[in-house]
């Protein structure tokens, strides 16, 4: 059974988070948390939080009635980093011109499955 968690509207560019998602895809959940814990990137904290949330969802008795989940047997089946909405800002330039600034956001989706 799949256990899912989503962090929507994360204020970080998808381009900065996708390499971190590639590091943990297919790994066991506890191993993925260990990998992310020692990454010096801000996106690692975000993915780590989503994995912890998915682990909590897996242990929730309301979502899994009558089943006990062994957390050690869960692995990261899917990590999707989708682009969210962009905030549009303007950077003033010389001679009255302006350049656009796109402040990008991300939707981070993690799916855990049992081995």
Regions found by a protein language model. Give the residues of each.
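Structured, basic alpha/beta domains of bacterial-type, RNA-associated proteins
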Residues: 1-12, 18-23, 28-115
């Amino acid at each position: 059974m799949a256990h899912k968690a989503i962090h929507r509207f994360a204020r970080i560019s998808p381009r900065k988070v996708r390499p971190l998602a590639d590091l943990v895809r297919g790994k066991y959940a506890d191993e993925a948390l260990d990998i992310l814990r020692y990454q010096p990137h801000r996106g690692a904290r975000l993915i780590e939080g989503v994995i912890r949330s998915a682990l909590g969802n897996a242990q929730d008795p309301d979502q899994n009635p009558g089943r006990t989940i062994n957390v050690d047997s869960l692995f990261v089946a899917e990590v999707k980093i989708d682009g969210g909405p962009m905030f549009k800002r303007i950077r003033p330039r010389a001679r009255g011109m302006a350049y656009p600034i796109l402040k990008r956001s991300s939707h981070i989706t993690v799916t855990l499955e049992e081995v």
